[in-house]
Amino acid sequence: MKSELNDDNLSIVKDYFNIVLVGNPSVGKTSILEKYVNNAFQANLENKKLIEIYKKQICLYTNSYKLKFWDITKFIGNNDISEIDMFYNCDGIIFVSSYDDKSSLENLNIWYQLLIEYVDLSTKEMVWLINKKDLNEGKVITEEQIEKKSKDLQLDYYEVSAKSGENIEEGIKKVVKKLILRCNDIEENDDNSFESSTADSANSIDIEEGKSCSIF
């Protein structure tokens, strides 16, 4: 039987995690990571790489963990996804949609089905972020649609803003916390001992479509 989390029974089984972000282009995946890692925001970021890599070190449950984020900046077709190692080797998956892009909600199913074809999702921890929560007008996705999609795909979700940073840390924390608990075979509880990060960095790599990339 699994036990509850406390500092006495938590061991560092694994001190780094690979997390992949997927979703439509221009929904704010890179902006979310820029805000989370560098506390920076720039509207209309243009990505010329297939993949952007961000790294961040965090302290959770008094231990230090290294996070490596793989930002898929372009839509990957069915022939490409099977050849990219990150989907096999990742620990967590963050789906991203945007309030001003209705197709980003619809295409969530496409990403999900592509991943199911090549990856055992029962071995991954996942969360869904809906960006641009800060918009006062121009939203084309309703809360009812979000609730239904969350239920259909069984995804926890967070409404976030890459501009203000609202709920970004909470959403990413959800994935990381689940990963730590999974590694330690511990039940999730309401513990909130999540401290700020120390070392941050962001890097990008240029990967040709269809080529594989190594993890750590």
Language model features with spans:
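TRAFAC-class small GTPase G-domain
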Residues: M1-E187, F216
